[in-house]
Amino acid sequence: MKTQRDGPSLGRWSLVLLLLGLTMPLAITAQVLSYQEAVLRAVDGLNQRSLDANLYRLLNLDPRPTLDGDPDTPKPVSFTVKETVCPRTIQRSPEECDFKKDGLVKRCVGTVILNQARDSFDISCDKDERKVARLGGFLQKAREKIARGFKKIGQKINDFLGKLAPRTEA
């Protein structure tokens, strides 16, 4: 009676297992995302969680910090997204959408994991304070201009009333 060890199938299986073992590290390496790819996935996740009417698209990605080699370690990220013209309800990539004129800009910070199998991110976004600061400066200038106008009006009223006052002659 012939056993499997005696036949050529054991040699074939050994060869298959050896080749499979050699290709596994390549498959694991292929699952690591680049820094920008991880951020784009985070933007997609933000769009899915968003209650806003339109999609957001990556506007600016801050320079990549020095990263360690472990794709499972959370990496710090900071970037800016801007509202697009595409409604959130359509199935379209934000990269295919134009930015909305005067669209909302959000500043986002957090962490991403580069291991594609884990696909994890922890990002929070706030309205871009730089736009708000510019608006605050505009409002401050407008307030000062209005105050100067009221002061001039007050002075003219005072001058007018001064002319109406009865003059007493001595």
From Swiss-Prot:
Function comment: Antimicrobial protein that is an integral component of the innate immune system. Binds to bacterial lipopolysaccharides (LPS). Acts via neutrophil N-formyl peptide receptors to enhance the release of CXCL2. Postsecretory processing generates multiple cathelicidin antimicrobial peptides with various lengths which act as a topical antimicrobial defense in sweat on skin. The unprocessed precursor form, cathelicidin antimicrobial peptide, inhibits the growth of Gram-negative E.coli and E.aerogenes with efficiencies comparable to that of the mature peptide LL-37 (in vitro).
GO BP term, pick one: defense response to Gram-negative bacterium
Propiece residues: 31-131
S-S bonds: C86-C97, C108-C125
UniProt similarity note: Belongs to the cathelicidin family.
Transmembrane residue ranges: none
Annotated region (Active core), positions in chain: 150-162
Modifications after synthesis and translation: Proteolytically cleaved by proteinase PRTN3 into antibacterial peptide LL-37. Proteolytically cleaved by cathepsin CTSG and neutrophil elastase ELANE. After secretion onto the skin surface, the CAMP gene product is processed by a serine protease-dependent mechanism into multiple novel antimicrobial peptides distinct from and shorter than cathelicidin LL-37. These peptides show enhanced antimicrobial action, acquiring the ability to kill skin pathogens such as S.aureus, E.coli and C.albicans. These peptides have lost the ability to stimulate CXCL8/IL8 release from keratinocytes. The peptides act synergistically, killing bacteria at lower concentrations when present together, and maintain activity at increased salt condition.
This protein's record includes keyword Phosphoprotein: no
Name the UniProt record assigns to this protein: Cathelicidin antimicrobial peptide
Domain topic, free-text comment: The cathelin-like domain (CLD), which is the propeptide part, does not seem to exhibit auto-inhibitory function, as it does not inhibit the antibacterial activity of antibacterial peptide LL-37.
InterPro entries (alphabetical): Cathelicidin-like, Cathelicidin_CS, Cathlecidin_C, Cystatin_sf
PANTHER family per record: CATHELICIDIN (PTHR10206), CATHELICIDIN ANTIMICROBIAL PEPTIDE (PTHR10206:SF2)
The entry's keywords: Antibiotic, Antimicrobial, Cleavage on pair of basic residues, Disulfide bond, Immunity, Innate immunity, Secreted, Signal
Cellular localization per UniProt: Secreted; Vesicle
Signal peptide: 1-30
The species this protein was found in: Cebus capucinus
Annotated GO MF terms: lipopolysaccharide binding
